Amino acid sequence: MNWQLLARANTHPLRISILEVLAIDDGRTLSPNELSQELRTPLSNVNYHVVQLLNSGLVELAGEHPVRGATEHFYRLPALSPAEA
């Protein structure tokens, strides 16, 4: 694990909140839109930070769903390997 990336990814309070929401109930799968509503934060801000978490490996793409000519993406926390658990 790249600890520098992990530390940098967790320096923003919104990223921590996103990770906390995704961790509820042993892991949830949510779209940035759903996270935005739950966190009462603008979608553009949530989407930016979800992409940063995705790039750092702290969340993973769980699926896609077509919505009105666009594609809604859903994210979750990656599963821990037995060595990490």
Show the residue positions of the predicted features.
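A short acidic, leucine-rich amphipathic alpha-helix
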Residues: 34-37
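Short, hydrophobic-biased segments on the C-terminal half of alpha helices
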Residues: 50-51
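Short helix-capping/hinge SLiMs at alpha-helix to coil transitions
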Residues: 23-27
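Key DNA-contacting residues within the recognition helix of helix-turn-helix
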Residues: 46-47
